[in-house]
């Protein structure tokens, strides 16, 4: 269960239950999880060294794209969580990013954060 041991993962999600579920799943596989429920919090969290970021597209105080742009410039791999069905723009803008539909199945989330395929 140490598939993510030593990795620090940001989970930016404003739905408390979903944030808790994602954080718990990643922590169960050994990740150190940093959480944020707002754009302001996600920006603050992006100041530390991150190995991956799991980002809700729409946070309580705004769109996550400014944080995603910053993380992209820093070379941090990202996985977007969304309930939207049309996400072509995300994969065009952030070519290396993965997109998962909410709620993400644990094995798909793990594969995305590890960088592999489920």
Language-model features: where?
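Two-component/phosphorelay signaling modules centered on CheY-like receiver
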Residues: 16-34
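Acidic catalytic/metal-coordinating carboxylates
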Residues: 61-66
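A short, hydrophobic beta-strand element within the central beta-sheet of small alpha/beta folds
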Residues: 75-87
